[in-house]
């Protein structure tokens, strides 16, 4: 599944909204925001996909 801005993903009952996807130096970074706390985070796409599951019926 292609990660896109605006998608909602979850982990351990917490929801995260993808706020940006950026390619830098042969790596894809995913920037995302915790929907409950508002804290923003980023990690490599591979790590993001290993940690989170997409919520397919919501944007």
Language-model regions: role of each:
Residues 37-59:
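Intrinsically disordered, low-complexity, charged/polar segments
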Residues 1-12:
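Short coil-to-beta transition motif at edge beta-strands of beta-rich domains
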Residues 12-45:
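Basic/aromatic-rich interaction segments and small domains that mediate binding to polyanionic partners
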């Amino acid at each position: 599944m292609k990660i896109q801005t605006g998608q909602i993903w979850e982990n351990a009952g917490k929801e995260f909204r993808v706020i940006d996807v950026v390619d830098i130096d042969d790596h894809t970074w995913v920037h995302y925001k915790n929907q409950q706390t508002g804290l923003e985070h980023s990690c490599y796409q591979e790590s993001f996909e290993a940690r989170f599951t997409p919520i397919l019926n919501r944007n």
